[in-house]
Amino acid sequence: MQTHEIRERFTNHFVNAGHQAVPSASLILDDPNLLFVNAGMVPFKPYFLGQQTPPFENGTATSIQKCVRTLDIEEVGITTRHNTFFQMAGNFSFGQYFKEGAITHAWGLLTGSVADGGFGLDPERLWVTVYLDDDEAAEIWEKKIGVPSERIQRLGMADNYWSMGVPGPCGPCSEIYYDRGEKYGKEGGPVADDNRYMEIWNLVFMEKERGQGIGKDNFDILGDLPKKNIDTGMGVERVACILQDVENVYETDLLRPVIDVAETLTGTKYGSDNTSDIRFRVIADHSRTGMMLILDGVTPGNEGRGYILRRLLRRIIRSARLLGATGETMEQFMNTIMDTMTPSYPEIADNRERIMRVAVTEERAFLKTLVSGTHLFEEAATSIKAAGSTKVAGAQAFALHDTYGFPIDLTLEMAAEAGLEVDVEGFDSLMAEQRSRAKADSQAKKHGHTDLSIYREWVDNNPTVFTGFEELDSQSKVLGLLSDGAKISEATEGQEVEVILDQSPLYAESGGQLGDRGQILLGDTVLDVHDVQKIGKKLWVHKALVANGGLAVGDEVVASVDKQWRHAARQAHTATHLIHAALRQVLGPTALQAGSMNKPGYLRFDFNYTEQLTPAQVEQIQAITNEAVDTDWAVNTVETSLEEAKAMGAMALFGENYGSTVRVVEIGGPFSMELCGGTHVAHSSQIGPVALLGESSIGSGVRRIEAYSGLNSFNYLSKERALAEGLASSLKAPSEELPERVAQLVDKLKAAEKEIEALHRQQLMAQTADLLNNAQEIGGVTTLLLRVKDNTNAGDLRTIATTLKDKLGDREGVLVIASDNAGKVPFVVAATKAAVARGAHSGNLVKLVGSYIDGRGGGKADLAQGSGANIAGLESAFGAVRAEIEAL
């Protein structure tokens, strides 16, 4: 039975039983604690917790959820039962049926006849486990279903009490196992041999909520869930393994085709030895996982999800090389896995080109690194072993990372294969030093000095109270003054200083928003604040110029925000949130923020996306953003716990460290809800118009949108309008006809350029007609050494040379054509086929000429070109060429 049929039978079984079929959610969810969806119930978590009402007609649902687990990537392929990507088929009940219903449904599908839509498994080969004290489940299995008591085994919390490993729903579970027969191990049920007895379905009786803890059995139970729920998960790949009667999941119809392709590409046979087999399985598993991650919008990167994808793709590449592949392999692997997965995921067809481009681009980049880095590692490993050591030094691992881009996990893998260990502590120490230097450089740029210990006293004892959300003017006390990185007791007129206040309404740069501008006032004393930076997330440092008067530590002052600056900064920051929301509407949920910068009237927003946006997409994003502005939504902020914010649906950035209390900025309810500590307008209409300036690539898988907001946007649009009106006037056409008129002009220009080029080539041919009259016969070789008119470009020289060479036909001939082109000396050398046979080589002659005119170049035996800088040496170069031809 093919995998897609297994999926269909599962879904049909539960739909016929009144469950609503729910499509698989994306592997990427807005959860800062979750890299990828790793269980079938994850998309249903809010319903299990009672935070949202299940939208399913009968309170029941079924889905086949794509999942990724990457905690033990290194183990993939070593065992044959685990995959990084898997499909979890599940049925869910939210307060409807409980243990008996879940058990009955599962047993009916597994043992039901194939003719009736079941899987037709032999009931005598099925075993079950239950939680230690779950007498109710054990009784249902024995009394209601008829499973003999000797095939019902009880296990502890680590095996039969399910949770996600983090706070959330949990409960006892009952697992169904299939006995694969005595050739796979000893008898005695799952407790005796879990290789012979393969787990295929887990029925979780979701009735409790777990708290913090470690491991599978060391956590607190916080209490009961609002309702008794059912969450089950059947491993599609494992059931396929049984129904297709193959040894393991890698032999099924989904993964075996990739192994077959790998055999062809590498010349190695699967099954020949264990080490090779592990590499084959790595290729098959990672090809599927990598493809599905790219499908859901993940791009290779150096952290978070992007790093996991990069690591998977690089393990594919390296495994293929170790098996014997010599060229690129990613295209073949990706094509194969897309073919096998498309019947279950038809959306692959629409994304095929993008998936291929991302994977192949990563392969080509890594292959350049792999060869040189592997050579360096092998040299290091040889010297380490020769010295009688078994450890790769931290400095060596760091050099591989810093110079060749080798991630530490790849070095660890290579070291293990070579029987070596790695000084990970030493590596981490060097990485920390590098980060510290980078941080110091960044701080030096912001503060003019790298020693931040000078702020320690205030950070520890007098953190700044920020009042800028409530007021723009604040009574403050001067706690400290600094100049050129040193503490001072007073500041005088004309001095550039850093001012520490006990409280301040001025926003310190963070979250992409620039620090406020403003003033610090005391009587006639005026300090113009031109930047505010944050130290240790607690201390505000006001960089200011004493414009008038003087200031001393202990003075009571008024700190005042430049109100125009703040208003325009608020406009830009709120516009950033709207653009982010619009991006996700147009491009999908994986278009997540990768960075931003907001300042008055201007913003730039970086986001994860692999492809250039079309003009239509940019226009749509701008339209959605301005519609949100026009709707005049209230911009609400609330401080709450991180868990509550996530329950509200607030978007958090993966990898960010959030405190126990976070600030949620909500605009238009579900339209935009993000964790943010910045300043914002009160209503979206206060932003004014938002004008997108365009989008561009700033790195692999990261793109940038830039925009104006408020008055800057109005001014920009006014200039654009004036430009359009000017063009319309010049072209004597209405504005709406400008695109067509400009296109017509461009077409005419291209046609004129082609005509000019044709005339130019005609003139060139006419000029070359008699040039061979200047040729000399040197030892039977027709030789033309010629300086043509000045400012003849390299392309024309090449045309002249090839034309003359063709005219020589079967004769032995060598041509050197050069010109003085604004101080540069382009030149071309050509040799006929007969001359090449005699020993002439254009590439060698180019190097010879270049040595006389301070130039260089290269090419093939029959045609080569170069460029020099010393026209005065050309005659000597010609003489050298004559001598070279005489020697042929």
Curated annotation (Swiss-Prot):
Using the UniProt record, give the first listed, main subcellular location: cytoplasm
Catalytic reaction annotation: tRNA(Ala) + L-alanine + ATP = L-alanyl-tRNA(Ala) + AMP + diphosphate
GO terms, biological process: alanyl-tRNA aminoacylation
Protein residues bound to Zn(2+): 573, 577, 676, 680
A Pfam entry, by short name: DHHA1
Q: Give the required cofactors.
A: Zn(2+)
Q: Which GO terms describe its molecular function?
A: alanine-tRNA ligase activity; aminoacyl-tRNA deacylase activity; ATP binding; tRNA binding; zinc ion binding
Q: Per its UniProt entry, what is the enzyme's top EC class, as one word?
A: ligase
Entry GO CC:
cytosol
Q: How is the cofactor bound?
A: Binds 1 zinc ion per subunit.
> What keywords sit in the KW lines?
Aminoacyl-tRNA synthetase, ATP-binding, Cytoplasm, Ligase, Metal-binding, Nucleotide-binding, Protein biosynthesis, RNA-binding, tRNA-binding, Zinc
UniProt-listed SUPFAM superfamilies: Class II aaRS and biotin synthetases, Putative anticodon-binding domain of alanyl-tRNA synthetase (AlaRS), ThrRS/AlaRS common domain, Translation proteins
Protein's UniProt keywords contain Cytoplasm: yes
- The transmembrane residues are none
Q: What does this protein do?
A: Catalyzes the attachment of alanine to tRNA(Ala) in a two-step reaction: alanine is first activated by ATP to form Ala-AMP and then transferred to the acceptor end of tRNA(Ala). Also edits incorrectly charged Ser-tRNA(Ala) and Gly-tRNA(Ala) via its editing domain.
**What's the family?**
Belongs to the class-II aminoacyl-tRNA synthetase family.
Domain comment (free text): Consists of three domains; the N-terminal catalytic domain, the editing domain and the C-terminal C-Ala domain. The editing domain removes incorrectly charged amino acids, while the C-Ala domain, along with tRNA(Ala), serves as a bridge to cooperatively bring together the editing and aminoacylation centers thus stimulating deacylation of misacylated tRNAs.
Query: How is this protein named in the record?
Result: Alanine--tRNA ligase
Origin species, per record, is: Corynebacterium glutamicum (strain ATCC 13032 / DSM 20300 / JCM 1318 / BCRC 11384 / CCUG 27702 / LMG 3730 / NBRC 12168 / NCIMB 10025 / NRRL B-2784 / 534)
* Source species taxonomy: Bacteria, Bacillati, Actinomycetota, Actinomycetes, Mycobacteriales
Gene that specifies this protein: alaS
